[in-house]
C-alpha cells in the first residue's frame, strides 16, 4: 500500500460495506496514522440558530440556515455537509449505544449526519455508496454534570412531548469542542444507516474515547416521550454481523482541526 493520503482514502472508499451498527475489536483493526486530520468547520461558532425537535423517536437537531457546517479530511474524499444530529439511548447506562468497542457499552450514542457535497441533498446522497458520513460519539454516564451539555440539556427540557421543538443556538454543539476530540483516535468503516431503510451508504467515524454526560442530564433525554406519550425507553438497533472481507480501520489522529 502506498503511503499517501490519496491512496489511503481511496482504499477506504472501496472497502466492502456492512450493515450497522457493529461490534468492533480494536486489536483486530489495521492501524493507520497517515490520514489528514478531520476538520470540523462552523459547528458551534457560526452564530446561526438551530431547531431541537422531539420527532417521536429521538432528539433531533438541525440548523435553520442553508449555511451548514462542513466536515472534511480523515477517510473522506471531498466535503460533507452537516444535515442533522440525533441521539440513541436505552433505560440503562450500558446498552444505550449502538456501536460496541471491545465489547464495552455506554449510556448513549450521538450521531452527526452529513451528506456528500457532490449531491444536491441528503435524499439524493442516500442512493450512493459515498453519500453519507456519520460521526459518532459514545456518551458515558457519570455522576457530575458536564457543563458543556448545559445548553443542549436546557433544550431537552422544552421538548419532552412528541413533535415539540425549540429554537437553540449553535452553542448547543459546543460540547464537541474539547482537546480529547481534537486529538482523539477513531475507527472508520463502510456501513449503513441504523434506521430504516438501512441503506449501505455511510462512511462511519466513531471516536474511541467516550464523552462524559451527567446522569441527571441523561435523565432528561430519557424522559422524552414518543407519540403515545410514553417515554422513549430504547431507540437502539442491535449490532449486525460483519460480512466476509469487511474491514474496520483504526486511525491514530495527529490533531483534528475543530
Feature locations, PLM:
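Alpha-carbonic anhydrase
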Residues: 1-258
Amino acid at each position: 500500500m502506498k503511503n499517501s493520503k490519496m491512496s489511503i482514502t481511496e482504499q477506504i472508499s472501496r472497502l466492502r460495506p456492512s450493515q450497522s451498527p457493529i461490534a468492533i475489536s480494536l486489536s483486530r483493526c489495521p492501524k493507520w496514522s497517515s490520514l489528514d486530520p478531520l476538520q470540523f468547520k462552523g459547528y458551534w461558532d457560526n452564530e446561526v440558530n438551530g431547531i431541537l425537535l422531539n420527532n417521536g423517536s429521538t432528539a433531533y437537531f438541525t440548523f435553520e440556515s442553508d449555511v451548514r457546517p462542513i466536515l472534511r479530511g480523515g477517510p473522506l474524499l471531498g466535503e460533507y455537509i452537516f444535515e442533522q444530529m440525533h441521539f440513541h439511548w436505552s433505560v440503562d447506562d450500558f446498552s444505550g449505544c449502538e456501536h460496541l468497542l471491545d465489547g464495552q457499552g455506554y449510556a448513549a450514542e450521538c450521531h452527526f449526519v452529513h451528506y456528500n457535497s457532490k449531491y444536491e441533498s441528503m435524499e439524493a446522497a442516500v442512493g450512493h455508496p459515498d453519500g453519507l458520513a456519520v460521526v459518532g460519539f459514545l456518551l458515558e454516564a457519570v455522576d457530575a454534570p458536564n457543563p458543556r451539555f448545559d445548553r443542549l440539556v436546557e433544550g431537552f427540557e422544552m421538548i419532552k412531548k412528541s413533535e415539540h421543538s425549540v429554537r437553540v443556538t449553535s452553542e448547543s454543539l459546543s460540547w464537541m469542542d474539547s482537546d480529547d476530540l481534537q486529538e482523539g483516535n477513531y475507527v472508520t468503516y463502510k456501513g449503513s444507516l441504523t434506521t430504516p431503510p438501512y441503506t449501505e451508504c455511510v462512511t462511519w467515524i466513531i471516536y474511541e474515547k467516550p464523552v462524559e454526560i451527567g446522569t441527571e442530564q441523561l435523565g432528561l433525554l430519557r424522559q422524552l416521550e414518543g407519540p403515545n406519550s410514553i417515554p422513549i425507553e430504547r431507540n437502539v438497533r442491535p449490532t449486525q454481523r460483519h460480512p466476509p472481507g469487511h474491514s474496520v480501520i483504526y486511525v491514530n489522529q495527529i490533531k483534528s482541526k475543530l
